């Protein structure tokens, strides 16, 4: 659903909040020439495969150049011979039942890395989050009801954690214990840290379950850890526990191959009859692949968020392992889940699908490139909403590449990442944040670019009970207001 409102708060009240996973942003698009971190640049074939997609991704002449990120030297010394290894998987979290939805939405909107109010309105963040979550909860519950009543993200993350531990042991001889820290719902990151402390972990690998780094996903989770580590250096300082962060891993060969293999499986499923149906004078290429990445507003990229470049690089690497256009496969890239009145990264998925239909595309594989497990944005937004739009647009043969979930090659790649991190110079949370411009956002927030309605909170009144809840909400030790079950 496209939302265009002059009032920022009014627009927020219409957000399908169950789909808002991160809000970072983009400016002018240029193909990446070099891979961030370790590794080399993209191959010429990968860059060529993305030419068409890159040409689509323009925000106009007003877009600003991306802020360059200066590399940060890693900490001296590597983690050697740890006695108790822990792996902390960071993820978004999601409501497990309908009763959890409102609390989950509140925590999402109360995060200033997701919704940034202008400085003068920042003290109202908790109240705004309460109003939005209360208003949006019924519709969001309907979305979750359509996929079984709750998010499966925790189930998949637990399965990934368990299998990764097994792979670490079998492939690398490393005994480790995995912990899960969710940003917006149980088990919260703070709970994971308590367990890590109680278990006496002295070497911790921090692995965000987001292949591409964004200030509002991996960055937001790392902020929580950074604040906790700073406040409790007696528990988490270098004298007690070494830690190292894997900030992004979109360019890992095992990850790239895993995604490409799943796409190939879907491409191979088109029958000869469907191939014939998809070939015409209007559309000579019979099979098409649409990478649908989570979109983000432009202002974050202008502040240095590397997410856009990493998406482009990632799609280029995967595309290089797929059949070429001469071999009957054409690649496209779009961005989904935009909300509110500000400019987001283009082209939008709900614009691209009708356009592909007009071009005579009949056979399409949609790839949820930002996600490593099924959740509301794959199971409801893509599988239900976008599928219906595609069929209405004349794309008769629809396929969706599954998320990686517990794919064996992906699990092994997770284990390999952790094992390598234990034997390489460590990268601290602070270094990871600085290297990816976390905390480098301009004081002018996303919302400061929008007109604030003078009619109050989007014209929606709030009663004394709601205001009282805002005042009574307890703050955790990091001065972040969070809502938990029973609040």
Each predicted region: which residue ranges?
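Active-site-proximal alpha-helix that buttresses catalytic centers in soluble enzyme cores
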Residues: 56-487
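N-terminal, immediately post-signal peptide pro-regions of secreted/luminal proteins
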Residues: 28-65
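Alpha-helical hydrophobic packing sites
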Residues: 27-28, 37, 95, 296
């Amino acid at each position: 659903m496209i939302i265009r409102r002059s009032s920022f708060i009014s627009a927020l009240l219409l957000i399908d909040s169950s789909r808002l996973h991160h809000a970072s942003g983009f400016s002018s698009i240029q193909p990446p020439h070099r891979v961030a971190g370790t590794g080399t640049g993209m191959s010429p074939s990968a860059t060529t495969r993305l030419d068409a997609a890159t040409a689509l991704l323009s925000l106009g002449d007003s877009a600003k150049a991306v802020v360059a990120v200066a590399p940060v030297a890693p900490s001296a010394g590597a983690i050697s011979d740890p006695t108790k290894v822990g792996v902390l998987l960071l993820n978004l979290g999601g409501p497990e039942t309908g009763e959890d939805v409102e609390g989950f939405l509140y925590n999402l909107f109360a995060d200033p890395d997701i919704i940034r109010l202008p400085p003068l309105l920042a003290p109202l963040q908790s109240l705004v989050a309460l109003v939005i979550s209360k208003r949006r909860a019924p519709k969001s519950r309907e979305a979750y009801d359509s996929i079984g009543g709750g998010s499966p993200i925790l189930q998949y993350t637990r399965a990934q954690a368990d299998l990764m531990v097994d792979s670490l042991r079998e492939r690398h001889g490393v005994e480790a214990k995995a912990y899960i820290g969710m940003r917006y719902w149980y088990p919260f990151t703070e709970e994971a840290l308590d367990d890590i402390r109680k278990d006496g972990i002295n070497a911790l690998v921090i692995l965000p379950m987001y292949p591409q780094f964004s200030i509002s996903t991996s960055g937001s989770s790392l902020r929580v850890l950074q604040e906790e580590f700073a406040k409790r250096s007696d528990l988490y300082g270098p004298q007690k526990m070494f830690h190292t962060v894997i900030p992004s891993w979109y360019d890992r060969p095992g990850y790239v191959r895993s995604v490409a293999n799943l796409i190939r499986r879907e491409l191979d499923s088109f029958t000869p009859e469907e191939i014939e149906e998809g070939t015409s004078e209007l559309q000579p290429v019979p099979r098409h692949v649409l990478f649908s990445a989570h979109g983000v507003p432009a202002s974050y990229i202008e502040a240095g968020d590397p997410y856009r470049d990493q998406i482009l690089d990632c799609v280029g690497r995967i595309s290089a392992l797929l059949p070429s256009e001469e071999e009957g496969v054409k690649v496209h890239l779009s961005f989904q889940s935009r909300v509110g009145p500000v400019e987001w990264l283009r082209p939008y998925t709900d614009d691209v699908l009708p356009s592909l239909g007009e071009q005579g595309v009949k056979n399409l594989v949609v790839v949820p490139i930002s996600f490593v497990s099924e959740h509301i944005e794959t199971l409801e937004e893509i599988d239900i909403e976008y599928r219906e739009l595609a069929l209405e647009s004349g794309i008769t043969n629809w396929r969706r590449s599954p998320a990686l979930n517990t794919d064996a090659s992906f699990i092994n790649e997770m284990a390999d990442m952790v094992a390598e991190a234990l034997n390489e110079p460590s990268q601290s949370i602070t270094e990871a944040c600085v290297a990816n411009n976390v905390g480098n956002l301009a004081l002018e927030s996303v919302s400061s670019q929008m007109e604030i309605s003078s009619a109050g909170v989007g014209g929606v009144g709030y009663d004394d009970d709601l205001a009282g809840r805002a005042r009574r909400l307890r703050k955790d030790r990091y001065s972040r207001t969070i809502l938990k079950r029973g609040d």
